[in-house]
Amino acid sequence: IGAEYMHISDPVEKKWFRERMEKKENQLHFTSSGKKSILNKLIQAESFEKFLAVKFVGTKRFGIDGGESLIPSLEQIIKRGGQLGVKEVKIGMPHRGRLNVLANLLQKSYKRIFNEFVGDYSSAKDSTGDVKYHLGASSNREFDGNLVHISLTDNPSHLEAVNPVVLGQTRAKQFFHKDIKRQKVIPVLIHGDAAFAGQGVVAECFAMSGLKGHNTGGTIHIIVNNQIGFTTSPRFARSSPYPSDIAKMVEAPILHVNADDPEAVVHCARIATEFRQKFNRDVVIDMICYRRFGHNEGDEPSFTQPMMYEKIRQHPTTLN
């Protein structure tokens, strides 16, 4: 784990973050059951993608292969959030990994997801005009006796366009919950590395994040940094060292973490949730991973990134 927090001007926030990262009692530590639940989520995530790859060969699904640690980290945000008073989590994300999140986090039935693959819909109301990796869902999850409502917002193909929608929904929900402290409803936005650095709407949302009329009490951002945007390498996609550098405009702390260490990713998710609930400010997790297959499952990535994909082919999965 690498942390960027020295750009924060508030000494209280800076001290909290330093102690949260460096104090011995705050170090990475999981109980046996905690480790098992992380492993369980990784098995679910990887098995889901492998099943789809075998059953629906070459069909677009925009799998999370290589970034499976996203699933246990989202689970941790909901679990820790529930302990800290969160009643509702609003999630916005692109198509990469969406089906996995629907199945393994929101517990959308496998039957409905597979029906969407074969084009068999049970009713005319089933959003039949849209592709399966644009659809949202909502469900209730219970952890440690805390019931948390999770909803994943529908989105178009336009990357990051869902961000202001999620923030607006969050703000509205806080109004209806009479959530003046902005502790009961939290937004979680998941991004790709190229889109986070490249799309102007990201900067616009940061610019409005502290304004009285638009503030949602802080967003947890997770960048699924697979080090490639369609076929574009990072050095051709941005001028800054990290995709997360845009977040420094609002002095958001940034956690860089290796996605092949799922315990570290979950630890970062815990820190991010605690920071957001304590200081009501944005926080960013830069989850550095890779994309095992092409941009979609019909692409051959080694045409444009031969050396990268030679290494990826030899690289074991997170589970292995």
How does the language model describe each region?
Residues 1-201, 206-219, 225-235, 239, ...:
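Conserved internal helical-beta-strand scaffold that buttresses enzyme catalytic cores
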Residues 196, 262-264, 291:
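Acidic, metal-coordinating catalytic cores used for nucleic-acid/nucleotide bond scission
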